[in-house]
A protein has these predicted regions:
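Charge-rich, low-complexity N-terminal segments
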Residues: 1-161
Length: 161
């Protein structure tokens, strides 16, 4: 049976301050610029969750959408919408609440929960995409998906000056 991908898009508004405790104040300002504002700043995020699995012959669907929406509400919207991300236990410490790190946390939660949405446990998380601005978006492929992108031969990369 072919594997199909289904993507659902969610919206949330949240604020954060990018500040690494391992850097001094000047290094933080140099690294994060206006994103290091002591009061934080906000974004209207769009989060795409892509799942992969067989199409159910009875329903014609890859995923039970109300179950996926309930998971997103509980683990994404209720947790981060209208919140200051620095107050979240995951980001309350050395883990800077960048959009990339938000993606890592969302991927971690959904990777464990998505298979439970399917009684046959054939459904898998494929990708998390977070759009931070109209110009910036971040994709995280779930483990197993990224292996196909890693070349078997390692090439030496030169740093960009």
């Amino acid at each position: 049976m072919p594997i199909a991908h289904f993507t659902r898009r969610y919206r949330l508004s949240a604020s954060h301050r990018l500040h690494a405790p391992s850097l001094n104040d000047q290094q933080n300002r140099d690294t994060y610029g206006k994103c290091n504002n002591p009061y934080g700043h906000g974004h209207n995020y769009f989060v795409e969750v892509t799942v992969a699995g067989p199409i159910d012959p009875e329903t014609g669907f890859v995923v039970d959408m109300p179950k996926l929406d309930a998971l997103a509400k509980r683990e994404l919207i209720d947790r981060f919408d209208a919140q200051h991300m620095n107050a979240d236990p995951v980001f309350n410490g050395d883990f800077v609440p960048s959009t990339e790190n938000l993606g890592i946390e969302v991927e971690r939660v959904f990777r464990r929960a998505v298979p439970l949405l399917d009684p046959t446990c054939q459904l898998r998380l494929h990708r998390i995409r977070i759009e931070e601005t109209k110009n910036n978006s971040f994709d995280l492929l779930a483990p197993g998906q990224i292996d196909a992108l890693i070349p078997h031969e390692q090439h030496a990369l030169q740093p960009i000056a």
